[in-house]
Every structure is written in structure tokens, then in C-alpha cells.
């Protein structure tokens, strides 16, 4: 029996490096896709790391724009660009593990190619988080940026289309 090829994808830091190192130590890591490889994170075979840097720079540039929508727009643009560009690296995965909001398009392709898909969420359920933040914004007389609704909808679409959802928290 062939060893499953695991592809881990994360545009952010989170704990993705630990996940990738764990998969590598078991002989399963086929590829680790990330926005920018952090050199202080050691222990990964460099030949298994794919960097997709442009989305991170686009996101940083947008977040520097003044206004309440900038941060939400930076997530929307950066994560969607990362997701779109990372698709080319998931075709040969047997298991595709991606972090929430960074993988709807790549997840769809991986599934079409026969991979088992896992979406990981590092926070509260998106609907709960959306409701909580909307209430908090209102308490302070602020308007919750409408762009966050689009982000929320993508989170839910990833959940609906993935085979498994992983939450590494009890929150």
C-alpha cells in the first residue's frame, strides 16, 4: 500500500508549521504551501515547501489604506489570491489540509482529483464569531464592515464542501 501524500496549505503562520513537521516526521508530507516561508521555522525539508508570496504583499498594501473596510478587504484579496494560486500545487494530494478561508478553490480541485479534504479553523465557528463581532461593533457605535459577510460566506462554503472540519480549540 502506498503512503498517502499529504499537502498542507496555510497563508498564515498559525500552527501550520507544526502540522507540516508532524506529517513530515511520519513520512506523509508531500508538500507544504505557504505565503512566505519563515526561516526561523526549522525542521521542514525545504524541497517540500512552496512559497506563494504575492498575496501577502497585496494584503499588506491594502491593509495600510485608511478606512474601516481596509482590513476586511485585505483578507478578502490576499486569501482569495493565495487560494487561487495554490491550486496548482494540490493535484497530486491524497489528503489536502487547508486553513479556513484560504482554500475553497484549491479544495474543490483537490476533491475533483480524489483527495480527502480537511478544513481547519483556529477560532470560533464563523457564524458565532460574525454575530459576536457585529454586536461588539454596535456597542461602540461602529458599523461592522460588510466585507466580513463575504468572508463569512466563504468559511461556510469551505465547511460544506470539505470532508472533515478540524478545530484545534475548545472555544
Tell me the role of every PLM-derived stretch.
Residues 36-95:
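Active-site donor-binding segments of glycosyltransferases and PAPS-dependent sulfotransferases
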Residues 11-12, 74-82, 98, 102, ...:
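Soluble or luminal CAZymes and related metallo-dependent hydrolases
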Residues 83-93, 104-108, 112-113, 125, ...:
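Membrane-proximal helix-turn-helix segments that form the acceptor-binding/catalytic region
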Residues 17-19, 42, 106-108, 128-129:
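Short glycine-/acidic-enriched loop or helix-start segments at secondary-structure transitions
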Amino acid at each position: 500500500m502506498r503512503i498517502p501524500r499529504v499537502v498542507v496549505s496555510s497563508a498564515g503562520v498559525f500552527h501550520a508549521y507544526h502540522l507540516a513537521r508532524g506529517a513530515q516526521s511520519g513520512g506523509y508530507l508531500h508538500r507544504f504551501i505557504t505565503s512566505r516561508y519563515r526561516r526561523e521555522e526549522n525542521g521542514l525539508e525545504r524541497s517540500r515547501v512552496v512559497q506563494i508570496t504575492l498575496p501577502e504583499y497585496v494584503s499588506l498594501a491594502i491593509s495600510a489604506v485608511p478606512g474601516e473596510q481596509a482590513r476586511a478587504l485585505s483578507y478578502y484579496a490576499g486569501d482569495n489570491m493565495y487560494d487561487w494560486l495554490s491550486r496548482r500545487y494540490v493535484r497530486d494530494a491524497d489528503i489536502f489540509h487547508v486553513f479556513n478561508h484560504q482554500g475553497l478553490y484549491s479544495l474543490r480541485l483537490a476533491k475533483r482529483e480524489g483527495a480527502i479534504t480537511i478544513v481547519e479553523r483556529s477560532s470560533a465557528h464563523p457564524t458565532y464569531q460574525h454575530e459576536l463581532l457585529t454586536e461588539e461593533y454596535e456597542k461602540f457605535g461602529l458599523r461592522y464592515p460588510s466585507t466580513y459577510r463575504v468572508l463569512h460566506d466563504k468559511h461556510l462554503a469551505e465547511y460544506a464542501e470539505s470532508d472533515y472540519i478540524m478545530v484545534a480549540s475548545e472555544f
